């Protein structure tokens, strides 16, 4: 039944889908154009471009999933179609999350300043460390996707047993096992979350100490460099906040099958996920000078907060 909640959900989904494709498509087109013209691309821009491209795929997958939730919810957890969506979603989403982690580590090693020997060793080898992380992320994404095979086998056994009489207890146990496997699939995301959290917190700690020192020794408390570091801290905090909200959406989607209002929980999880894919990509534009300058030039009126002269944490 198509009600008020489904109507609002559909409007939000379509709006976020269009905005997400525009924002991420802008990142891909601008960076690809510079790459084609100069025949080279920095590691950070390569990661950002790859991330935007994978987010476009994610937006399409989530949009298709949203249409199934609204118009054919009874078939949402069944059939080959949903298994294909699960496979593409798992790989694309897992690799996208690791791309965020790689970008976080890269910014941390490039911007943060600590005197610890281990940190300095990693800082001098930042590019090699991040490239190694990218290969590891690709491998882990493949492994996490292959782990779905066991979940599909359980679901297949569950489907076959429905047509067999006197199998109530077996069906109940298999359903519990299937739901548990689905929830445990989120454990693959924990390592990338920890890596990103550590990188973000180190960045905030380093920028906070640096800003404090500059305010202490600077005659003018509104020193341009201090203001730049404050802006960087706000941007990093925004990244962290969006990232935590994205993981919250996973928890909602995974636990939805254990809640009385399963459909509502899934709707909330989908809206949060798509909001993240739009909002976080916009922050990527704001904190990247090349993307920001092009974006501001395309605006019909000049925005004070996005003037080309204002610098983010990344100058690449």
UniProtKB/Swiss-Prot annotation:
Biological-process GO terms, alphabetical: detection of chemical stimulus involved in sensory perception of bitter taste
Superkingdom of origin organism: Eukaryota
Gene3D superfamilies noted in UniProt: Rhodopsin 7-helix transmembrane proteins
Intervals, Cytoplasmic compartment: 29-50, 108-128, 208-234, 288-316
Membrane-spanning segments: 8-28, 51-71, 87-107, 129-149, 187-207, 235-255, 267-287
Extracellular side: 1-7, 72-86, 150-186, 256-266
Membrane recorded as keyword: yes
Keywords, in A-Z order: G-protein coupled receptor, Glycoprotein, Membrane, Receptor, Sensory transduction, Taste, Transducer, Transmembrane, Transmembrane helix
GO CC entries: membrane
Bridged cysteine pairs (disulfide): none
Location of this chain's protein in the cell: Membrane
Positions annotated as glycosylated: 166
InterPro entries from the UniProt entry: GPCR_Rhodpsn_7TM (IPR017452), TAS2R (IPR007960)
Chief location bin: membrane
Membrane topology: Multi-pass membrane protein
A molecular function GO annotation: G protein-coupled receptor activity
Family (UniProt): Belongs to the G-protein coupled receptor T2R family.
Further comment: Several bitter taste receptors are expressed in a single taste receptor cell.
Function per UniProt: Gustducin-coupled receptor implicated in the perception of bitter compounds in the oral cavity and the gastrointestinal tract. Signals through PLCB2 and the calcium-regulated cation channel TRPM5.
Name of this protein: Taste receptor type 2 member 3
Natural source organism: Mus musculus (Mouse)
Lineage, uppermost ranks: Eukaryota, Metazoa, Chordata, Craniata, Vertebrata
Annotated gene: Tas2r3
